């Protein structure tokens, strides 16, 4: 009886493993191989988009933490370039989701937009209002002459520095909290306006 139970348990475990292995992989985590890098939209579900967005957020958070916790002198390469080129998965997922959230939007995609909009707003504020991160950016900005940057690199540095300032990096804690609240409200209003506009456009 013990042997029968053992083999039954082993068979069940193998079956469960087989089911897990058969679960379709998220297409957003693989390279798009179609011509011109077109996404395989027919294979991507709303759950895939949600999973991709959340993973992309976590990856970018890890990149930001690595910059902040680095003991190296802030430079264009280890700070500005990482900020400029980081968040690759998040950009890919949001860029792929974009067309589906406009003309071909469904109730599911609209619901995902509403779910993620305040999360994206908070994520952006967490980056651009982060005092420790801005200190690294400012250190590169204030000492840019010694880095012998190219014209393009200077432009990237200026744009990123301005983005931090425009997004509230120089505000005090109370002002930042108020701006965060306004940003969240604005993101939801912009989303609602966009969804209403799409709805009316599709009716005509």
Roles of regions detected by a PLM:
Residues 2-20:
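Gram-negative bacterial Sec-dependent N-terminal signal peptides
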